[in-house]
Amino acid sequence: MAKLKGIKKIDKIINNFTRQFGVIARFDTEFEAFCDDMTVGYTLLGSPTGTGDFIADATKRYPDVTADIFLWALMHEIGHCMTENMWTEEEREYFWDQKDVIMSAEIGIEEMNAWYHACPDEFFATKWAGDYMRNHPKKVGKFWKKLQPAILDMYKRNGLI
């Protein structure tokens, strides 16, 4: 991955926020969680709608949370790390197997989304994210107020907008 001008500033802002959860964030090719070492990956170069379009599910479940799509995606990944201890190793393996089945099934997008979001680890990661943003709107707003200009600056400095 090429080095982007301004990404260090974004990393610093995000990690100053995620530190409260014991989570480290790093720029990556997609949004993902590595719960074993409490790390989340985030991207700024593509759509964060992710597998199963959790953003549509999240905003349907939390219509009162008016967060940017980037925040939803980031907080969802943090939510995976924060809820990881709810599951046994066998349950986590089962969830992965179920997601493999979902992704390979020949079903419509609505059915896939419903099935995907019914996976307990996905459901509770989104629940954690929505509950946190609902219960801490000032903290999340302050974070976004710092982060959004840094993201826009990075896009400009790299000729992306």
Language-model segments: what does each one mean?
Residues 1, 27-31, 103:
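Long, low-complexity, intrinsically disordered N-terminal extensions of eukaryotic proteins, enriched
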Residues 1-3, 20, 63-67, 90:
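Selected N-terminal structured segments and early membrane-anchoring regions
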Residues 1-4, 82-84, 130, 135:
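N-terminal low-structure segments adjacent to metalloprotease catalytic domains
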Residues 4-24:
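Zn2+-dependent metallopeptidase catalytic core
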Residues 23-70, 78-85:
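Active-site scaffold of zinc-dependent metalloenzymes
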Residues 41, 67-73, 81, 85-117:
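Acidic, low-complexity, intrinsically disordered interaction modules
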Residues 68-72, 76, 123-127:
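A structural signal for well-ordered alpha-helical segments within the folded catalytic domains
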Residues 95-161:
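Metalloprotease/metallohydrolase-associated module, dominated by Zn2+-dependent proteases
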